[in-house]
Design a protein with these regions (language model features):
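Flexible, solvent-exposed loop/hinge segments and secondary-structure transition points
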Residues: 1-139
């Protein structure tokens, strides 16, 4: 029998709370999504005035980071520069995205989920997501 680690709702809630607190301090509204080990949505938040377009983007960033087992900006780097990787259609999944801001959460050497942020620059999204993912990995 195979077993695997996945983040749970309390992990997801802790990550969301951290992201929302930091974004509030910056006075920058964001959308945040946390996915389980399968890439499926576990928790989600959209701050007031966060762009509606960021809803799907945040969810897709969490999906991509889980399924690709790497930060979404790395997926983007590979598809923007064919010499480093391949076209996004290679993944065969329209939910895959290469915008920064999705970060996998690792437990016991395997991806246990992902945290994603959308609504700011890719760099700011990635920074917030990485800090929240670290809270889950290192409670």
């Amino acid at each position: 029998m195979r077993t695997f680690s996945t983040i749970d709702y309390s992990d997801a809630r802790r990550a969301l709370d951290h992201i929302l607190e930091k974004a509030s301090q910056l006075k920058k509204p964001v959308v945040a999504a946390v996915a389980d080990a399968h890439g499926e949505l576990l928790a989600f938040a959209r701050m007031d005035d966060a762009p509606a377009s960021s809803i799907t983007i945040a969810i897709n960033k969490a999906w991509t980071a889980t399924r690709a087992r790497k930060p979404t900006h790395e997926v983007g780097e590979r598809v923007r520069h064919p010499e480093k990787g391949h076209d996004i259609s290679y993944y065969g999944d329209p939910k895959f995205t290469g915008w920064g801001g999705g970060v996998p959460v690792w437990k016991d050497g395997k991806v246990a989920g992902a945290v994603a942020v959308s609504g700011l620059s890719s760099e700011e999204d990635a920074e917030l997501a990485a800090a929240a993912a670290a809270l889950i990995t290192n409670p």
